[in-house]
A protein has these predicted regions:
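Active-site loop segments of alpha/beta catalytic cores
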Residues: 1-213
Length: 213
């Protein structure tokens, strides 16, 4: 696995978060130009990695956080105009080399999933089911035939603050729901936070090893 193909995030790192969000509305020409330049860099960088890998890189990790706890960070229309086309171009290059695209975006993103799929992702990563509207059963039923899922075990509640039994229950639910007929990689809903009980982390993996979807 290689890469971190962010486009939206790389752009706002350069301009500042609030400033770039304002650019999208007040100075769209500049925003488009910055995103285009970032994409050109990411495509060339990714191409060099894949060429150096000589067919041995199975997976490229990309991502742009577009979700918050309550909904999308930017409107879906803004995402479609400014962000999606650039990831389509990047993902096309990744697929040309026979690699798979795993795409990270956490938060409440249900309404964006069809467009994430349309831009060429293969694996949707993070799966923050603590966020509004995120539903494992609906994701699997609606998109599970063509999209793989990774993550889901809560780093906001279950892993840091739950009991071992809570972790076992949640892990079992996710494996049986998202893992039915394959297409699920168990993992936390984001980075495991400092102070998370080690026994809870172990319970997540031990439970998964004992289960069949």
């Amino acid at each position: 696995m290689s890469g971190w193909g962010s486009i939206f995030e790389a752009a706002w790192y350069m301009r500042g978060f609030e400033q770039f969000l304002m650019d999208l509305i007040l100075n769209p020409e500049m925003a488009h130009t910055i995103l285009k330049k970032v994409t050109e860099f990411q495509i060339e960088h990714t191409r060099m990695i894949l060429q150096a890998g000589k067919g041995k890189i199975d997976l490229i990790f990309c991502g742009d956080d577009i979700g918050m706890q309550q909904g999308l960070l930017i409107s879906l229309d803004t995402f479609l105009e400014f962000i999606k086309p650039h990831h389509v171009a990047l993902n096309k290059v990744i697929h040309e080399y026979g690699s798979t695209v795993i795409f990270h975006t956490d938060g409440s993103i249900m309404k964006a999933v069809p467009d994430l799929m349309d831009m060429g992702i293969d694996i949707l990563q993070a799966l923050q089911f603590d966020a509004v509207g995120m539903d494992a059963g609906m994701l699997k039923e609606t998109y599970g035939k063509t999209l793989c899922f990774e993550g889901g075990v809560s780093v906001q509640h279950t892993l840091p603050f739950g009991t071992v039994e809570d972790v076992i229950t949640e892990t079992t639910h996710l494996v049986h729901t998202l893992g039915k007929d394959g297409g699920y990689i168990l993992g936390p809903s984001h980075a495991i936070q400092a102070g998370t009980p080690a026994e809870n982390v172990l319970a997540m993996f031990d439970t998964a090893l004992e289960l069949e979807p």
